């Protein structure tokens, strides 16, 4: 029996290895439905271990960090910005603690074996992505602004994944000619992705290789290899004229709008982090972004994973994650290879949202060292095993429920997604632009009950209230929409039009007091725009998108004609 149990734990390597190989092909695991699928596989493996009485638990720093992320996402049902999307966030990151639990069943030396075939999978992705991108109907799936994005559909994280594979090739074992094709595929994929940050990280990895590898043959091979790649890249730019991918490296600058923008995102997010120790919850940053930004931008993520962690789930999970990282860097297990596999994604995560892709997050947690806690493992007793089986079963049902709704939403079927999960806030919001006049108000109310920070819902509610003659309510909702979209000039113009039309109706009814109140609010609009412009940061004036906060001439003319009326009446 003992021998069978040992064989079963060795058997874990195969499904975990295939999971790491295939997950990047599921859009990198970026969408909740992909995470739900990964979670179901991991839950099945854990239930098998529980049934055989083989599951051992170590309350390691990586496990506590991963588990806290899931628990605090669930807590967003209580304190988060969007209560409806909180369970979606929990499912999105549920694979992390499950994966760490399974890793703790393996000997430390076997964990790194899970990565041995990753360079092959990366090479296959490069080849498939290039070939499929040549098909016009499939090109948009694999290309972003002329840059190869792989199955991740995002060039920067795709490039990071390839760099991870390249590090495995260069430092995993002595570099031989047989490995050069895998290294070449990864390097070419990085160049075609046009990711400048990963390109500079690649140069740093090559320098580390030269200074740490003693074999002169290996150095010569990598030197010839790098020179050949550089020649091919320059030739490609000259012949094709395509600067959207390889050519982007020639335009790298610390003053580039993309780089300055990332600094701006962080600058705007820091005060929010200090005010919300429990985080904003899943999608909270995206919804509230317009209320605190000091420049013109619209992003789903802050492009810094530590800040994103603080924004989403608050201080405690972030502190646990930093503790796990500290232990990982202090550990001597795995040598230089593991240190590089840890450092490379972490450095890139400071400028992008890589761990939102669950496949990258799994790789990061794999190289976090859990060996020091191995001596503190314990086997749950019968009661705990039953409780654990119950929790895993509920988690599986949650994955099926949320994952199904997410997949329907991914297929652009929001109405069907809502039949599965009625609190899917994003799906309800997607129905607003095409809703009938009768449905507009109730749909907006459904969104606002779950998340009061959706500007689109406030706009819809304002439209419904205005149609029903509820002028005061319409004005209040329009003001809230402006607060959430301070740099959107269209919001101010709509607000102006509502007030102007309301004023005319009040005048027709002889209600001069209400008409004057509307006029006073209209007169305040230029001042509102000037305030936002004055609050625009220096960084906000450097990035490509500049504030457009000037009223069009017809609106200015109307103000000039009617401002004197307000002065005389007051």
Question: Model-found features: residue ranges?
Answer:
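TM-adjacent membrane-interface loops and short helices in multi-pass inner/ER membrane proteins
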Residues: 261-299, 313-319
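Alpha-helical transmembrane segments of multi-pass inner-membrane proteins
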Residues: 13-29, 37-48, 70-77, 89-102, ...
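Flexible juxtamembrane loops connecting transmembrane helices in multi-pass membrane enzymes
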Residues: 147-151, 205-206, 233-267, 408-417
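Juxtamembrane loop-helix boundary motifs flanking transmembrane segments in multi-pass membrane proteins
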Residues: 106, 140-144, 258-261, 265, ...
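Short aromatic-rich membrane-water interface segments that cap or initiate transmembrane helices
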Residues: 29, 80-83, 145-158, 254, ...
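Long, contiguous interaction/recruitment modules in multidomain scaffold/adaptor proteins
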Residues: 321-414
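Transmembrane signal-anchor hairpin modules in multi-pass inner-membrane enzymes, especially those
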Residues: 1-120, 172-178, 207-224, 372-473, ...
């Amino acid at each position: 029996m003992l021998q069978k149990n040992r064989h079963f734990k060795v058997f874990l390597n195969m499904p975990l290895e295939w999971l790491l190989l295939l997950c990047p092909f599921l859009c990198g695991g970026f969408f909740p439905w992909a995470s739900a699928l990964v979670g179901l596989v991991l839950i099945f493996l854990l239930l098998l271990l529980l049934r055989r009485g083989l599951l051992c638990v170590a309350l390691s720093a990586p496990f506590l960090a991963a588990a806290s992320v899931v628990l605090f996402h669930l807590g967003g049902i209580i304190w988060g910005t969007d209560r409806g999307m909180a369970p979606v966030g929990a499912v999105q990151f549920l694979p992390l603690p499950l994966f760490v639990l399974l890793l703790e069943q393996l000997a430390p030396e076997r964990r790194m074996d899970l990565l041995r075939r990753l360079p092959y999978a990366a090479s296959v992705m490069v080849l498939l992505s290039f070939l499929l991108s040549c098909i016009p109907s499939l090109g948009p799936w694999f290309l972003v602004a002329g840059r190869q994005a792989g199955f991740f559909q995002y060039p920067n994280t795709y490039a990071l994944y390839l760099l991870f594979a390249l590090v495995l090739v260069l430092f995993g074992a002595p570099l031989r000619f047989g490995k050069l094709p895998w290294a070449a595929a990864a390097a070419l994929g990085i160049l075609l992705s046009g990711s400048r940050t990963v390109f500079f990280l690649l140069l740093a990895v090559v320098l580390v290789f030269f200074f740490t590898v003693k074999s002169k043959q290996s150095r010569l091979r990598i030197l010839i290899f790098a020179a050949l790649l550089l020649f091919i890249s320059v030739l490609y730019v000259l012949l094709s004229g395509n600067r959207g991918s390889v050519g982007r490296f020639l335009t790298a600058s610390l003053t580039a709008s993309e780089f300055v923008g990332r600094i701006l995102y962080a600058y705007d997010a820091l005060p929010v982090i200090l005010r919300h120790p429990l985080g904003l919850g899943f999608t909270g940053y995206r919804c509230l972004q317009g209320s605190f930004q000091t420049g013109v931008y619209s992003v789903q993520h802050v492009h810094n994973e530590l800040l994103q962690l603080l924004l989403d789930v608050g201080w405690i999970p972030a502190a646990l994650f930093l503790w796990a990282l500290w232990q990982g860097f202090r550990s001597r297990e795995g040598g230089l290879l593991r240190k590089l596999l840890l450092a490379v994604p972490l450095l890139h995560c400071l400028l992008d949202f890589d761990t939102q892709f669950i496949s990258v997050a799994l790789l990061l947690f794999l190289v976090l060292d859990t060996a020091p806690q191995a001596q503190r493992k314990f086997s749950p007793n019968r009661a705990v095993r039953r409780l654990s089986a119950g929790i895993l079963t509920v988690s599986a049902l949650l994955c099926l429920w949320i994952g199904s709704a997410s997949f329907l939403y991914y297929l652009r079927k929001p109405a069907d997604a809502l039949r599965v999960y009625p609190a899917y806030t994003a799906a309800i919001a997607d129905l607003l632009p095409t809703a009938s006049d009768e449905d507009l108000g109730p749909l907006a109310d459904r969104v606002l009950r779950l998340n009061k920070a959706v500007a689109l819902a406030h706009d819809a509610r304002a439209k419904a209230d205005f149609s029903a003659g509820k002028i005061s309510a319409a004005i209040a909702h329009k003001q809230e929409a402006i607060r959430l979209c301070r740099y959107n000039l269209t919001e101010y113009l709509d607000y102006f039009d509502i007030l102007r039309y309301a004023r005319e109706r009040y005048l027709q009814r002889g209600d001069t007091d209400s008409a004057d109140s509307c006029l006073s609010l209209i007169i305040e609009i230029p001042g509102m725009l000037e305030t936002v412009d004055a609050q625009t940061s220096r960084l906000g004036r450097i990035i490509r998108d500049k504030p457009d906060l000037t009223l069009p001439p017809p609106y200015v003319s109307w103000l000039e004609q009617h401002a004197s009326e307000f002065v005389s009446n007051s």
